[in-house]
Amino acid sequence: MSKKQEVKYYGSSAGKDQLVYGVVHIYASFNDTFVHVTDMSGRETFCKVTGGMKVKADRDESSPYAAMMAAQDVVARCKECGINALHVKMRATGGVGTKSPGPGAQAALRALARAGMKIGRIEDVTPVPTDSTRRKGSRRGRRL
């Protein structure tokens, strides 16, 4: 059995000069990079591609190259749906994990812009702990 996905067109019928926005959620950890496009409310997913879907080796999932390839796939799918502009929400692991995004974050954003998508707002949505669980490491911290 083959599943056939129907393509909904969200672009305007008036012309190509109007901007039709979507939201791209880029989650860049040090193990993988997710590029996920939704509508403005965040309810409907148009496309979701990870770095692991683009490369074979586990060590390359979070690489800038894998993030760039994932972003190019996302742009192709967005253009099918009629989306020509994106608001960007970038996220690192956060919480008790690291608050700096992984190596694929910058590469994914650059690939989106170079592929012809208009970039609206860029926002950092990394979760910040407000008195959370105990962090990894001893009482004296991680000793190098």
Curated annotation (Swiss-Prot):
* Gene Ontology cellular component annotations, sorted alphabetically: ribonucleoprotein complex; ribosome
Q: Could you identify this protein by its name?
A: Small ribosomal subunit protein uS11
Q: Does the keyword Lyase apply?
A: no
InterPro entries assigned: Ribosomal_uS11, Ribosomal_uS11_CS, Ribosomal_uS11_sf
The family annotation for this protein states: Belongs to the universal ribosomal protein uS11 family.
The molecular function terms of the Gene Ontology recorded here are: structural constituent of ribosome
Any Pfam family from its record, for instance, is: Ribosomal_S11
Where does the source fall among the domains of life?
Answer: Eukaryota
Keyword Oxidoreductase in annotation: no
Source species = Trypanosoma brucei brucei
Sorted alphabetically, the keyword list is:
Ribonucleoprotein, Ribosomal protein
- From the UniProt record, report the name of the gene that encodes this protein: RPS14
Give a GO biological-process term.
translation
